[in-house]
A protein has these predicted regions:
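Residues within the DNA-recognition helix of helix-turn-helix
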Residues: 30-33, 37-40
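The N-cap/first-turn positions of alpha helices
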Residues: 4-7, 31, 63
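Helix-turn-helix DNA-binding elements, focusing on the entry/boundary residues of the two helices
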Residues: 19-20, 38, 52
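Alpha-helical linker/hinge and terminal dimerization helices associated
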Residues: 44-45, 66-88
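Alpha-helical residues within the helix-turn-helix
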Residues: 25, 43, 64
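A short LG(V/I)-centered, amphipathic sequence patch enriched
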Residues: 42-59
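N-terminal winged-helix
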Residues: 82, 88-106
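Short helix-boundary/capping micro-motifs
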Residues: 13-28
Length: 106
């Protein structure tokens, strides 16, 4: 069984956001892409982790049990990325550039 980070992140985002569309926006996917990731994970696990409703999604009892593990997997992935960046001598984060409005128009 291969439980990859992208599929775990899709479930975590859907659970946090409450809809597949919001999860897709958060992760930079299309809603159908998120649905495919979740569906493939559920197929591999052999049970559903999300219930799809007209108003959004919610975790199944099995999904609630698995969510902490999915969160650990996604957190570990982020730690690996940050540590690798530090080893390479690069720090990750946002860069904010401020420009005065009269200069920005040129």
């Amino acid at each position: 069984m291969l439980v990859d980070v992208k599929r775990c992140a899709a479930v975590v985002a859907a659970a946090e956001c409450g809809t597949m569309s919001a999860a897709a926006k958060k992760l930079g996917y299309t809603p159908s892409g998120i649905i495919r990731l979740v569906d493939s994970l559920e197929e591999e696990l052999g049970f559903s982790v999300l219930v799809r409703k007209t108003t959004g999604v919610e975790l199944t009892p099995e999904g609630r049990r698995m969510l902490p593990l999915f969160e650990q997997i996604t957190a570990a992935d982020e730690q690996v990325r940050q540590t690798a960046a530090r080893i390479r001598g690069m720090s990750e984060g946002a860069i904010v550039i401020g420009v005065q409005s009269n200069v920005a128009s040129y």
